[in-house]
Amino acid sequence: MFKITRKHNLTDHVFRMDIEAPAIADRAQPGHYVDVRVNPDHSALTLPVVDCDRNLGTVSVVHRAQDLPSVQLSMLVEGDEVFEVRGPLGAPCTFPDVGKVILAAEDLGVASLFCRARTYRERGAYTICILGFENKSEVFWEDVFGAVSDELYVCTRDGSYGVKGGIATPMRAVCETYGDVERVVVMASLAQMRKAAKIAAEYDIPVVVSFDAIRPPIGSPSIFDVPDWSQEAFEFAKAPEIDAGDVDFDKLLAKEKAFFRISEDAANA
């Protein structure tokens, strides 16, 4: 059993939890994830490790209450225990030496972006962070990112807070302002990642993307497996970041649309 040592509501439906797991905390790096099982009778939640404290022996995860396993996890409080935490799983991120980097994320991807931003800042990079949300009520960790960013932009799709629009809007402005950005990291919706990749290409900036922000619910078929790539089918758990040039966004957007259409038809059956 693994004890929850801290729980913090980031929004009405998004929660951060610190879980006591010393063996995992000792080895976890940005890009790793864990499988969290609330009890032995239900599916595990696959969650990115957003932070860890080796002194306290805790790993931090952020999740949204949206399906049965995640709702069950959200109902637990400090002092409660989960049945199982497995990890660290997956592969860690790479951090090339760069002078200036743009890191952009939407929604839950913001949580995964934090440890990446902190690592780049610790390595001496000028760190520009762009955080995107649906509306003001969904905004979280603006203060946390303020501590690891040289520049910070917050945007909402409905314009209720910060810059109106998706993350691509402030990203273009930043690219126009600076001619020395050496890397872009994006974890957002497929549409926003495609826009970001096109903008970065216009300025000849290498860009990597992550699917952390749009991982499907547990038990759903992954829409991100692309068997006809020249490499193994992508799964977010196996490759935390991938070169945007290797992603066929048009194909993935078509698969995403088909996936949600099938899901909607099944729900209405």
Say what each PLM segment does.
Residues K7, H13, M17, R27, ...:
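Surface-exposed loop/turn and secondary-structure junction residues enriched for glycine/proline
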Residues R6, D51, V154-T156, V209, ...:
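Structural signal for conserved beta-strand scaffold positions within catalytic alpha/beta enzyme cores
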Residues N39-S43, R86-P92, E241-A244:
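Short, charged beta-turn/beta-strand-edge "cap" motif at the junction between a beta-strand
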Residues M1-E78:
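Ferredoxin-reductase
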Residues A196-K198, E202, I223-D265:
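Iron-sulfur (Fe-S) cluster-binding segments and ferredoxin-like electron-carrier domains
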Residues L68-G219:
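FNR/FR-type flavoprotein reductase catalytic core
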